[in-house]
Amino acid sequence: MRYALLIYNDSEVLERRPEEEQRRINNGIYEVLERPNVAGWLRLRNVEASTTVRYEQGRTLLTDGPFIDSKDYLGGFVLVESDNLDGAIAIAGELQELRAAAAIEIRPVLEENLVAA
């Protein structure tokens, strides 16, 4: 089964983090991402580069920035292959021990194809 680890960052923490500490964290993250059960990963640009699209009252609306105003923002995701949730939790736990994120949300990936009506 596949699990998506949604990585949430705190921009204030990242801005204050010393460069040497960030390098240490990045090296640890890289080791985790190189494992055979990590099927893929993506980093996202900062929230200032985001645009939110909504549909309200028959109109498409665009706004700058994230959907929710929060200090934590979605910074990327890791796709993990595991027999069960415990395997995904173990990888998320390792990333948290590195202090790689403010929070990591784990979600099972739907393996079904989208079927049109």
Regions found by a protein language model. Name each.
Residues 1-117:
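Conserved, structured core segments of small domains
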